[in-house]
C-alpha cells in the first residue's frame, strides 16, 4: 500500500500505528508503537484519511474515534466490527462465512487495495533496512531456510518434525545448506532438529535480526507466518505450506509454489486437525519443489 499512497499523494505525510515497528520501512514519516502515548497523540490530530485493515476491536475503535475526512476499512460500531463502506464488505463477509471464503479468488493484496479504493498492479513489499548483522555462514553454500513453526494460534498447520529432518538431510545431500528458522517458541524443537538432521541452527533473534537472517537464504520453506511475508518482501523463492486457508489469498509474485497435503480435509480455518493432515504432504514433493525453484 505504501507504494500506492506515495504514487497518489507524493507529498502526503504517512503515519503508521503498529504492534511491530521493526518491520516498518523508513519511507513512513512517523512510526508509532501501539502504546497509550501514541493513541493520545493520534486523538490530537485531524487526518485527511485513515486506513484500518484490521478487524480487531481495538483497531476498529480507533478508526471510529479518530478524526479524519475519509475513513476506509473496518470500524467498531456498538462493540461490533463493521465495514466502513461497500469496498470493505467483501473482506468482511469472507471473514464471517466459510462458504464465501472458499469461493474467494482474490489475493490478500487485491483485497486490501480494493478496500482502500485502488487496484492492485503487482506492487512489491517495501522492507526496512536491516544491515549491520554479521553471520557465520559458509561463503559458497546456497542456503535454504526451513521455518519450522506455524504460530501458536493454528497448530493444525505444523509439518511433522520427522519430515523436517528428512527434508534437511535431502537438501544437505544435494549440496545445499539447510538453515533452521524460528522464534523462541521453536527454539527447543530446532535444537533437536539440528541434532537429528545436521541442519544449521543459529538460534532465535530479535525481529530485525531475524529479517537479516531470512535475507541470507535463497529459498524459504514455511507455513503462512511472518517468515512468509519477510521472504516475499525480500524477494526470495518460497515453498509455502497451506492446509487451512484459501490458497488464492497468497500472491508469491511468481517466485514460489504453494503446496497442500494430498488429503481431503475439513480443517478449514481450524486450530486443530483431527486427521493431522499435514502428514500427507510428502517430503519428496517439498524437496522437488525446492529443487525446481532453485534451478530458476
Question: What are the functions of these language-model segments?
Answer:
Residues 1-296:
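Catalytic machinery of carbohydrate-active enzymes
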Amino acid at each position: 500500500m505504501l507504494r500506492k499512497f506515495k504514487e497518489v499523494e507524493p507529498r502526503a505525510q504517512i503515519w503508521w500505528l503498529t504492534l511491530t515497528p521493526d518491520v516498518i520501512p523508513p519511507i513512513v514519516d512517523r512510526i508509532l508503537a501501539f502504546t497509550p502515548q501514541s493513541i493520545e497523540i493520534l486523538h490530537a490530530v485531524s487526518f485527511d484519511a485513515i486506513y484500518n485493515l484490521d478487524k480487531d476491536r481495538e483497531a476498529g475503535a480507533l478508526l471510529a474515534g479518530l478524526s479524519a475526512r475519509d475513513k476506509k476499512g473496518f470500524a467498531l460500531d456498538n462493540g461490533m466490527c463493521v465495514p466502513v463502506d461497500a469496498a470493505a464488505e467483501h473482506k468482511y463477509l469472507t471473514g464471517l462465512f466459510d462458504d464465501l471464503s472458499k469461493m474467494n479468488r482474490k489475493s490478500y493484496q487485491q483485497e486490501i487495495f480494493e478496500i482502500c479504493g485502488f487496484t492492485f498492479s503487482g506492487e512489491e513489499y517495501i522492507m526496512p533496512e536491516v544491515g549491520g548483522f554479521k553471520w557465520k555462514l559458509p561463503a559458497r553454500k546456497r542456503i535454504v531456510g526451513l521455518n519450522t513453526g506455524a504460530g501458536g494460534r493454528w497448530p493444525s498447520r505444523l509439518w511433522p518434525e520427522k519430515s523436517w529432518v528428512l527434508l534437511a538431510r535431502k537438501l544437505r545431500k544435494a549440496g545445499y545448506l539447510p538453515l533452521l528458522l524460528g522464534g523462541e517458541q521453536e527454539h527447543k524443537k530446532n535444537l533437536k532438529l539440528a541434532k537429528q538432521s545436521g541442519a544449521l541452527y543459529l538460534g532465535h533473534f530479535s525481529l530485525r535480526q531475524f529479517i537479516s537472517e531470512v535475507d541470507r537464504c535463497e529459498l524459504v520453506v514455511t507455513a503462512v507466518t511472518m517468515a512468509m511475508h519477510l521472504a516475499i518482501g525480500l524477494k526470495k523463492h518460497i515453498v509455502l505450506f497451506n492446509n487451512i486457508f484459501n490458497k488464492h489469498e497468497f500472491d508469491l509474485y511468481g517466485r514460489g509454489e504453494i503446496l497442500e497435503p494430498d488429503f481431503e480435509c475439513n480443517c478449514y480455518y481450524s486450530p486443530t486437525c483431527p486427521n493431522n493432515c499435514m502428514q500427507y504432504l510428502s517430503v519428496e514433493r517439498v524437496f522437488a519443489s525446492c529443487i525446481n525453484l532453485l534451478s530458476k
